[in-house]
Amino acid sequence: MQDRIVRATAANGGIRLVAVLTTESSLEAKKRHDLSYLTTCILGRAFSASLLLASSMKIMHGRVTLRVRSDGPLKGLLVDAGRDGKVRGYVGNPDLELDLVKIDSNKYSFDFTKALGTGYLNVIRDSGIGEPFTSTVELVNGNIAEDLASYLYHSEQTPSAVFIGEKIQNQGIICSGGLLAQVLPKKDTDPLLVSLLEERCKEVNSFSEDLFQSKDNLLSLIKKIFPDIDDESISEKARSQEVSFKCKCSKQRSLNAMNMLDKSELEDILKKDGNAELVCEFCKNKYLINYEEIKLMIENQS
């Protein structure tokens, strides 16, 4: 199933609802970064969180960056997502594995809290106009969903509910995604809407299972929480949008990065190696900068 974002509203436009599926994007990241099951889930959660935030941006080239700086063995993460549905990212320790934690008599979960440890979630919103807006909040417990909800509460003062989860089987992750429900800014002082949001979200007992059952129809996932969504509240074109792992790196960007080195540094590379290989942190694509290209950079700085 193609990864996708689906949007809807409820309560006569007072509540915004967004659901996202990030299974294929998470698996692509696993392949590119050689992730463990644990880090695949963590990065998938961060993909879902960043795409949910980016979904509200008004311009298609708007972007959201999530960065976690913490003292846990994951060694942080960085994710970049666009309003266009493109997402990329990486973690500091891709092959991290930890013992599962028991959550009830027959269920176990990854230890996200131990993996991330204590630290901060940094959110950067870049609309492409003016300076990006940056906000930082302390990590709540490292499960990404509650950390994102904390950001929305403290930085945007928006009554929100965030659900993020995944489904794992022996072969690995088979489903990843999330859902965001928000009282819209002009309605956020309406106690009835805030109460409605709280009551509906209390009825969610197992989001990961709901996500798995609705992975082929995200609108049905939204309707499980808000069965009375507004009819035709959003145009069909705007309601559904494809999502994919996509990096912006290129050979030209690599050349530009090399060109920022001092002449002496370029000469040293030319003398020792004769060429340079640059590896993109986000997607692991490799770009070879050959002898002639480095020589031209040196000549241009002379």
Swiss-Prot record:
GO terms for molecular function: protein folding chaperone; unfolded protein binding. It is found in: Cytoplasm. It comes from the Bacteria. The keyword Phosphoprotein does not apply. The keyword Zinc applies. It holds the Pfam family HSP33. Keywords: Chaperone, Cytoplasm, Disulfide bond, Redox-active center, Zinc. GO terms for cellular component: cytoplasm. Disulfide bonds join 247-249, 280-283. InterPro entries: Heat_shock_Hsp33, Heat_shock_Hsp33_C, Heat_shock_Hsp33_N. Gene3D superfamilies: Hsp33 domain, HSP33 redox switch-like. Under oxidizing conditions two disulfide bonds are formed involving the reactive cysteines. Under reducing conditions zinc is bound to the reactive cysteines and the protein is inactive. GO terms for biological process: protein refolding. Its main location: cytoplasm. Belongs to the HSP33 family. Redox regulated molecular chaperone. Protects both thermally unfolding and oxidatively damaged proteins from irreversible aggregation. Plays an important role in the bacterial defense system toward oxidative stress. HAMAP family: HslO. This is 33 kDa chaperonin. The lineage of its organism: Bacteria, Bacillati, Cyanobacteriota, Cyanophyceae, Synechococcales. The gene is hslO.
